[in-house]
Amino acid sequence: LLDLVYNDFNYSHAGYYTLIDVARHFGFYCKVLSKVIANWQEFKAFIDKWAARAYIEGFVFEDANGFMVKYKTPWYKNWKQARGVLQQVWTGRDIDAIKNIKTKLAFEPRLMDAIPEFVEECREQGRGTCPSVIELRNWFEN
């Protein structure tokens, strides 16, 4: 459970501890409060520490006034972009043409080079639809 938003004209949502209670009541997993950050330096240190770690999609930060902002990690951005590349390669687009456009995958160039091989393996196995990025990730990371 990520949030409970009230049905009103002004955005408002339940507090964190109410969220925990509701999640527990219904048997849902609930987001985890990682840290209370007091200032910009602590915020930057938090991002620097966690941004490079794999398998973390991102964080939602909320200030004392209820303003929320979402931060997506490079790991998440890489795999999100890989999904688009996978779909393009599946439909027959040349990987070199994609590389000229999708330079942001440069921090994981092995992934860019592996996608055509993955697509070929899927086709050889008789697959008729584009595989998911989760299937690509499982294949790539194993």
What positions do the PLM features span?
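Core nucleotide-handling region used for phosphoryl-transfer chemistry
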Residues: 1-142
